[in-house]
Amino acid sequence: MLDLKFIRDNLELVRENIKNRGLKLELDLLISFDDERRKLITKIGELNALRNENANAMKDNIDDSSRHYLIEKGKALKAEIMDLEERLGYLTSRLLVEHKRIPNISAPDVPVGVSEDENVVLKVSGNIPKFDFKPKDHLEIGIHLDLFDFEKAREVSGNKFYYLKNEAVFLELAMINFAFSKLKAKGFDLFITPDVAREFIVDGIGFNPRGAESNIYKIEDTDKYLVGTAEITLGGYYYNTILDLKSPLKMAGLSHCFRKEAGAAGQFSKGLYRVHQFSKVEMFCFCRSEDSDRIHNEFLELEEEIFTELEIPYRVLNVCSSDLGAPAYKKYDIEAWMPGRGENGDYGEVTSTSNCTDYQSRRLKIRYKEDGQNKFVHMINGTAIASTRTLIAILENFQDAKGGVRIPKSLVKYTGFDYISPKN
């Protein structure tokens, strides 16, 4: 979250940022809570000073009448302090709720927009394949090649679940190994993270764990949630820690990701594109404030490198203000070309990377020492590989007229085969 002093000192900037993000928040309510809280803290301090004076006066050699008066005065002061502290506790909790709703300040070069249609294309890379046949979408390809089964998954688990089968199993594992090998060579520490996180960690990362708008699953009768991304478990790894940040601390984590995807429907959400469970390799970095823009750009370069080596055409987007998550200062999306998307093919999101500055670290109390002072770290996240959407892009871009699919050269050493043959 933002520093409260920063909010008070920059009210118009914060107000404009809220407007640009398409949010309706009661900033004045936050300030009124803080004003009253400050007054209460001052008043409680004054009353405690009076109570101490009263207690010291009772140590003097005084008559019974004066002692009785001081005792009653002490009781009255104690009762008043308790009442004010109860009010202070209530105000502090209300203040925290409103405070957490305030999004991060957006970077100066974030485009202002009201929908994802106003995301700005920064770069287009790769050659869109030209087929001498009508290309199939990944659903047709996968069913024909016996790579996944949605019907059985619907019976067993419900809508938006799937079984991966046969070569698709090797292909998913190959993508994960490919990403991990690349990130290990780039100096990342590798993790397989828990698929469950406590509520205060989920909340600290900036995911809203409660309410109808929540996109993650709560485990009943616990304070735990299934994670929607390893960003949650990697970001929480150093909760309440003071780090020795001689250099940026880079981590890469594999997790299953669970999403409710409530209300998601339509042709662009079919098949593997929007599902309740998938695997993802996530990149994460804890760094000093002066390094975060550079690391953010490095994460984008890594994502581009991955999709270039997978031979998948893509474009890079500078995400507009209303499409930013609350923690993000700036965000890039990569969209891969998917020939089976829509009538004539279209781009679909496959990765993103966000610089969240110190928004998450303030909630999670993750700091570093500099010149004898504790400062909040900056936190950057990014997708290396999201299994399902990358699988879509591979199946659709590398299909051939015979109904088979070529495997990208960079994955062959991990799959052990270079072609998925049509089934008779």
UniProtKB/Swiss-Prot annotation:
- Enzyme superclass (EC): ligase
The reactions it catalyses are: tRNA(Ser) + L-serine + ATP = L-seryl-tRNA(Ser) + AMP + diphosphate + H(+); tRNA(Sec) + L-serine + ATP = L-seryl-tRNA(Sec) + AMP + diphosphate + H(+)
Tell me the residue numbers annotated for binding L-serine: T229, A230, E231, E282, T383
Note the Gene3D superfamilies from the entry: Bira Bifunctional Protein, Domain 2, Serine-tRNA synthetase, tRNA binding domain
Q: Keywords for this entry?
A: Aminoacyl-tRNA synthetase, ATP-binding, Cytoplasm, Ligase, Nucleotide-binding, Protein biosynthesis
The UniProt entry, under PROSITE patterns, shows:
AA_TRNA_LIGASE_II
Pathway, according to UniProt? Aminoacyl-tRNA biosynthesis; selenocysteinyl-tRNA(Sec) biosynthesis; L-seryl-tRNA(Sec) from L-serine and tRNA(Sec): step 1/1
Q: Which Pfam families does the record match to this protein? A: Seryl_tRNA_N, tRNA-synt_2b
Family matches, as InterPro entries: aa-tRNA-synt_IIb, aa-tRNA-synth_II, aa-tRNA-synth_II/BPL/LPL, Ser-tRNA-ligase_type_1, Ser-tRNA-synth_1_N, SerRS_1_N_sf, SerRS_core, tRNA-bd_arm
Q: What is its main location?
A: cytoplasm
In its UniProt record, a GO molecular function of this protein is:
ATP binding
Q: State its Enzyme Commission number(s).
A: 6.1.1.11
Q: Where does ATP bind?
A: R259, K260, E261, V275, E349, V350, T351, S352
- The answer to whether keyword Transit peptide applies is no
Q: What GO biological process terms are annotated to this protein in UniProt? A: selenocysteine biosynthetic process; seryl-tRNA aminoacylation
User: Would I find ATP-binding among this entry's keywords?
Assistant: yes
**Which PANTHER family is this protein grouped with?**
SERYL-TRNA SYNTHETASE
> Domain comment, in the record's words?
Consists of two distinct domains, a catalytic core and a N-terminal extension that is involved in tRNA binding.
Q: Give the family per the record.
A: Belongs to the class-II aminoacyl-tRNA synthetase family. Type-1 seryl-tRNA synthetase subfamily.
The annotated subunit structure for this chain is:
Homodimer. The tRNA molecule binds across the dimer.
Q: What does this protein do?
A: Catalyzes the attachment of serine to tRNA(Ser). Is also able to aminoacylate tRNA(Sec) with serine, to form the misacylated tRNA L-seryl-tRNA(Sec), which will be further converted into selenocysteinyl-tRNA(Sec).
Q: What is this protein called?
A: Serine--tRNA ligase
Q: Which organism is it from?
A: Borrelia duttonii (strain Ly)
Gene expressing this chain: serS
